[in-house]
Amino acid sequence: MFDVLVIGSGHAGCEAAVAAARRGAKVGLISFRPNDAGQMSCNPSIGGVGKGHLVRELDVFDGLMARAADRAAIHRRMLNRSKGPAVWGPRVQADRQLFRSAIELLLQSLPIERIVGEVTSLRLNGNEVVAVVLGDGTIIKARSVVVATGTFLDARTYLGLECRSAGRAGERSAIPLAAQMREVGLAARRLKTGTPPRLDGRTIDWARLEEQPSDDEAWRFSAHPEHLPSVPQLRCAITRTTIATHDLIRKSEDQSPLYAGLIEGRGPRYCPSIEDKVRRFGDRDGHQIFLEPE
């Protein structure tokens, strides 16, 4: 019997498991694969305007994300420096493997039992969750269950107009659990995010781009006075779209799931996809494109 059982070992799941374990609870952490803890999805960055301060607030409560980001940072940038400190946006580009390793190290410092499997249903006693059931039929009892499945609940991915059931590129979606949660009347809404394309750096003429080096000041997200490993800092770069780019995007709008009527989820308010930028701000002669190390 666990005091706290956490489903999902992404950012939220790991934070929940650690917070419970530090309070003396017997904690189980369930994930699809043994090496999933701290796995970064989409764009491997932490922070930014409207987000970096949240990472630091997590750190105030002894969270993991800030410390892992500091250990994995390969590019640091304090955004909005031209404005007052209250709206500065600390942001790092992280090395995926270093970030995952940092989270794993922090998890291993606490008595958290790791469980590999897919939770296919919740066992209910009235309105109370008393256990979870894995895909192989294993029943795990718990006094409380934290659902931290992130993007995996009945998730879909689109590659052009091709739709696949996936929680992350190449990984399956948690369909049975999502179906049960709908059956018991839990409200659900889809969110939409776009994954930036990956480019082979050897095919890019870097000399024609505007370099964006890492900040000279090696600031940290975390206030913990711990020694950090020396991680080489890499450069990002900036370029811009052109009128020709916009014309090509407009001609290909019917190949975008966003405008083909396939996307149901609500996209991020301040980070529209490039085709959305061209449609909404078509009067501009160019939009910034950031090239970041992966």
Segments predicted by a language model, with ranges:
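Beta1/beta-strand and adjacent pyrophosphate-binding region of the FAD-binding site
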Residues: 1-12
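Redox-cofactor binding/interface segments in oxidoreductases and associated redox assembly factors
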Residues: 7, 134, 147-148
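Glycine-rich nucleotide phosphate-binding loop and flanking beta-alpha elements
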Residues: 13, 140, 152-154
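Conserved N-terminal/central alpha/beta ligand/cofactor-binding core
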Residues: 18-124, 144, 148-168, 172-177, ...
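Conserved beta-strand-loop-beta-strand element in the redox core of flavoprotein oxidoreductases
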Residues: 123-139
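C-terminal catalytic lobe of FAD-dependent flavoproteins
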Residues: 253-294
